[in-house]
Regions:
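Transmembrane alpha-helical segments of polytopic membrane transport and secretion proteins
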Residues: 1-16, 83-90, 282-363, 438, ...
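Membrane-water interface segments at the C-terminal ends of transmembrane alpha-helices
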Residues: 8-38, 48-178, 211-232, 236-238, ...
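Short, membrane-interfacial amphipathic segments enriched in basic
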Residues: 40-46, 387-396
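Alpha-helical transmembrane segments and their immediate interhelical/interface regions
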Residues: 52-80, 177-198, 278-308, 343
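Short hydrophobic faces within alpha-helices
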Residues: 96, 185-196, 264, 409, ...
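Short helix-to-coil transition segments within interhelical loops
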Residues: 180-212, 500, 506-527
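Glycine-rich helix-loop "coupling/hinge" segments at transmembrane-helix boundaries
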Residues: 230-259, 388-389, 546-574, 607-609
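Helix-loop-helix hairpin linking two adjacent transmembrane segments in secondary transporters
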Residues: 257-269
Length: 625
């Protein structure tokens, strides 16, 4: 057997073992969840329950509204900031935003907008002088009677979910836009669109955004699934009479009555059916809407004989027809810019975002800064009567209580480190060993935790832990957190791996270096920023896990998330804020370390190094030797 055939067989064997190691628990969990929802009597009881219809409607309304607002906010921020210094600054702030878990963000936002929160107190402080001066007679000594949190319309829940998902979609978009092949194609097509008379903003919306939206289908569906099925955030910010169907299913699954338990499984599967229907509708819209989008892009083609450009030149309709044909056939992707060509006046780096829109990135950053400040200040608040702007006393009692809960802190930290490390190792091994055809075929299975409702996924993990005898111990929790973090880690690594220049491996092979020497000396060092970022993403996902920790841990293990959500139902505001701040500080620290590890470095040339003006091949030759 030749060495190349032996290497290929080894890679296939390793990929098969990796697929089996992941597929077995995933499929087992799915099968357990399927069996839990086969009780016909539970479906009848679910249909007859008076809260089912209203809870389902609330789930649909809040989930769809939050997802639509998050997508619209992402699109506007990209249109107004991509290719400008604002985009670079926004990218630098994304790790801190992503590090803030959903539950911690919800708690911080509630501390801001609650009837006795910071914003109301600030408003009272501003209105009080006017009230005394004008003699308005406003009663400002008690919190207002309106509901800004857990309101019956779900507005607080929508605000939390929309604001929290925008950074995730921006991060997913940045991963696509930073791929050399995607950036090159969009730059060329935007230039061509502007030569045909479209403004920079119009070219972005007609050319770049439709293509980017198609590449963001998986992240958008993940946002939709999460918004429709979230439990911990709905418990904190959502209405309670009735709650969302996800919360109702969780409450029934917590019940000791087997009939109620079966109703909870049926409700979880009802959510799964709704999610599947919406995902199918999105796929159909993407498939059948492409032709309509292209036709709308070149609307007026039959009527207009010429299109006037800014310079006053004319472009014939035959050029527009050629452009439409090239776009539909993907011919523009095969165009290559001339070597050494300077960016044109119409390149996205200079004309996409001029003038308006700068407030969007600033408002998003300000919102996250205010939430973080509310968490930190809220954790040291003592006596704080309304309407005082500042508390009468500051205290560290909440942080002393956190320090006394050392097992909770160490469990949170240990689980996050172990599960994110395992997820990164598996994802790297899979991307290195699995053939592209295998990756495409198993993509649906790998992303299963992203598309299943969180209640249903936690139910399957619990049944898996019971069957394998790992219920209520740290091994079961590690497996559950790893399976939850893995899809996000894989999603963050696929873009950098897919955009890696494969020609570098050919150059290394021509210099007599093995594939593993190339991977160890060239590929992984070049991808260290992506690897560090994916580890940080997995860490943050593990810290944020609520339902898997409750179900698989059987209540024996507490984490910062479970403690913060549990304290939200009580009156210990400072202790709740302290655990929520801990939820944020741990991932923020890891994201900071990841940014430091992935930073660009400059090393002094060693003996025999290539000269600065050497070609890329000569530099690679000196690197691998």
């Amino acid at each position: 057997m030749s060495p190349s055939v032996s290497t290929l067989a080894s890679k296939h064997l390793a990929a098969a073992l990796l697929a089996a190691a992941l597929g077995l628990p995933l499929l087992w969990s799915l099968a357990a969840a399927v069996l839990a929802g086969l009780d016909a009597a539970a479906w009848v009881a679910l249909a007859a329950h008076p809260q089912t219809a209203s809870a389902l409607w609330l789930n649909l309304y809040t989930g769809l509204a939050a997802s639509a607002l998050a997508l619209a906010g992402t699109a506007l921020l990209l249109a107004h900031s991509f290719g400008t210094p604002r985009w670079t600054r926004l990218l630098g702030r994304l790790p801190a935003m992503l590090a803030l878990p959903h539950a911690a963000f919800a708690i911080g936002l509630l501390l801001l907008i609650a009837p006795s929160g910071w914003l109301v107190r600030l408003g009272v402080a501003l209105v009080t002088p006017l009230n005394a001066w004008l003699g308005l007679g406003l009663a400002l000594d008690a919190p207002p009677a309106w509901q800004s949190t857990q309101d019956p319309w779900g507005l607080g829940l929508i605000a939390v979910l929309a604001l929290k998902e925008i950074p995730f979609l921006l991060w997913a978009a940045a991963a696509q836009l930073q791929r050399p092949d995607v950036a090159r194609r969009l730059t060329l097509e935007l230039r061509l669109a502007q030569t045909l008379g479209y403004s920079a903003r119009s070219a972005w919306w007609r050319v770049a955004w439709p293509q980017l939206l198609a590449r963001l289908l998986a992240p958008v569906l993940a946002v939709l699934v999460y918004s429709l099925t979230v439990v911990d955030v709905a418990l904190l910010a959502g209405p309670s009479t009735p709650p969302t169907l996800a919360v109702l299913a969780w409450q029934w699954l917590q019940d000791a009555d087997p009939e109620r338990n079966a109703m909870g499984a049926a409700a979880a599967w009802l959510l799964a059916a709704v999610v599947a229907a919406l995902a199918l509708a999105a796929l159909l819209a993407q498939h059948y809407g492409r032709g309509w989008a292209v036709a709308r892009w070149t609307r007026g083609l039959a009527r207009a004989r010429t299109v006037e450009t800014r310079a006053g030149t004319a472009v014939s309709t035959s050029s527009l027809a050629s452009m439409k044909t090239a776009t539909e056939g993907g011919a523009l992707a095969r165009v290559r810019p001339e070597a050494g060509a300077a960016p044109s006046r119409g390149s996205p780096s200079k004309t996409i975002a001029k003038g308006s829109g700068s407030w969007g990135a600033g408002a998003l950053s300000l919102a996250y800064a205010a939430v973080a400040a509310a968490l930190v200040l809220g954790s040291v608040i003592g006596v704080w009567p309304f309407p005082d702007m500042w508390p009468q006393a500051w205290t560290w009692q909440a942080w002393h209580a956190v320090a006394d809960s050392a097992p909770v802190v160490w469990t949170t930290l240990g689980l996050a480190l172990a599960s994110s490390a395992a997820a990164v190792l598996w994802a790297v091994a899979w991307l290195e060993c699995a053939p592209p055809a295998w990756q495409r075929r198993l993509q649906g299975l790998l992303y299963l935790p992203l598309v299943l409702p969180s209640v249903l996924w936690a139910l399957g993990l619990h049944r898996l832990a019971l069957a394998w005898g790992i219920d209520g111990n740290i091994k079961g929790l590690w497996l559950a957190h790893t399976l939850c973090a893995l899809p996000y880690v894989l999603l963050s690594l696929q873009g950098p791996y897919g955009g890696f220049d494969a020609r570098l491996q050919a150059v290394a092979a021509s210099l007599g270096r093995t594939r593993w020497a190339f991977v160890w000396r060239i590929k992984w060092p070049l991808l260290r920023a992506a690897l560090a970022a994916s580890f940080a993403v997995g860490f943050a996902v593990s810290v944020a896990q609520y339902l898997p920790t409750l179900y698989v841990g059987a209540g024996r293990f507490g984490t910062a998330t479970t403690e913060a959500v549990a304290l939200a139902a009580g009156g210990q505001r400072s202790l709740m804020a302290a655990f929520a701040a801990l939820q944020w500080l741990l991932p923020a620290l890891v994201f900071g370390l990841a940014a430091w590890a992935g930073r660009a470095r400059r090393f002094a040339p060693h003996a025999g190094a290539a000269p600065p003006d050497a070609t890329a091949g000569e530099k690679l030759s000196h690197t691998v030797q």
